[in-house]
Amino acid sequence: MIQIIYVASPESQQIHVWKLDSIYGLLELIQVIYTHGQAQPMAVHPNKRFLYVGIRPNFGITTYRIDQIGLLADHGTIGIFSSPTHLISDKKGAFLYCTSYRNNTVSVIPISMSGMLLDSPIQIIEGLLGCHSANIDKFKKLLWVPCLKENAIRLFNINSFGMLTSYDPSIIKINVGSGPRHMIFCDFDCYAYVINELTSTVDVIKYNNFQKIPSIVQTVSIIPKNISINRCWAADIHITPNGRWLYCTDRSINIISCLEISKKTKKLKFVGYQLTEEQPRGFAIDYQGKFLVVAGQKSNCISLYKIDSDNGTLTMLSRYSSGKGPMWVSIITLNCK
């Protein structure tokens, strides 16, 4: 079994492919590919055989086939009508959902049985102001779309054809001025965690199949009390697979914050932070919850950290140059024969 890290660097129009050496805490560069423009959001097909990459300024999505050792091969690009901000596949790998912060849209793009994207979206929903990401909960029935400029999360039903219709209620209101951006779901219970870009906070949302209206049960800051900050600029959020530790980045003070998730209530407690790369735009956690890889958009480097399973502390293991403006990080596990 091997772990592969993909890092998209739009300024150099590259994707760097790294292999994780979990014994020595090192990354080995195994491939650099040049993209058809500024590569930004990435999404991996559930079968781990395809990587989808959003491209700017000529808006498109490129499909890359992933071979048995993680190397990428270009399998074509489709044009789309909006600037891609975030991509996610449904759990069956039949549809790709693409949000556009700039164009305020969510597009639904069919994926063929062969893994290729069809020529154009089958549905485009407009008027989602500052929609930053698309997210599918554990029941696989709802698409959650944080809309930064609305201070809200829009909810959509996903039907059997992948199409979206408004859920009732169709919106979760977030605190004014928060700017919801990215989110993650707890795999062991019905809780969602939303990072707010403009206040550097995380909202904890309780939901389930029978509770019609999801509700915010906690809002917690990711900024340490001993650090003064002139501007909040939170970016990314992820949870370890065991559901115990939640990590967030803030680009204004270049930190990764660690919060502990209560086993009983699923609420958060701030436990510490790690100074990291300049402008930590994106990061990812491996499938065992042992390693974290973060990209510095301004430092042009990525750092590999070891996660302490007992207290959530991060320890830097190694650091590497990874093109210009690295933003997106994806980690996959492959069964290598």
Swiss-Prot record:
Identify the keywords attached in UniProt to this record, alphabetized. Answer: Carbohydrate metabolism, Glucose metabolism, Hydrolase
Q: Could you give a GO molecular-function term held by this entry?
A: 6-phosphogluconolactonase activity
UniProt cross-references to InterPro entries, sorted A to Z:
6-phosphogluconolactonase_YbhE (IPR022528), Cycloisomerase_2 (IPR050282), Lactonase_7-beta_prop (IPR019405), N2O_reductase_N (IPR011045), WD40/YVTN_repeat-like_dom_sf (IPR015943)
Q: What SUPFAM superfamilies does the annotation carry?
A: Nitrous oxide reductase, N-terminal domain (SSF50974), Thermostable phytase (3-phytase) (SSF50956)
Q: Which pathway, metabolic or otherwise, does it act in?
A: Carbohydrate degradation; pentose phosphate pathway; D-ribulose 5-phosphate from D-glucose 6-phosphate (oxidative stage): step 2/3
| Major enzyme class | hydrolase
GO terms for biological process? glucose metabolic process; pentose-phosphate shunt, oxidative branch
Under catalytic activity, the entry for this protein gives:
6-phospho-D-glucono-1,5-lactone + H2O = 6-phospho-D-gluconate + H(+)
Pfam families reported in the protein's UniProt record: Lactonase
> Which cellular components does GO assign to this protein?
cytosol
UniProt KW Transport keyword: no
EC number per UniProt: 3.1.1.31
Residues in the signal sequence:
none
Q: What does this protein do?
A: Catalyzes the hydrolysis of 6-phosphogluconolactone to 6-phosphogluconate.
Protein family membership: Belongs to the cycloisomerase 2 family.
Official protein name in the record: 6-phosphogluconolactonase
Q: Which species is this UniProt entry from?
A: Blochmanniella pennsylvanica (strain BPEN)
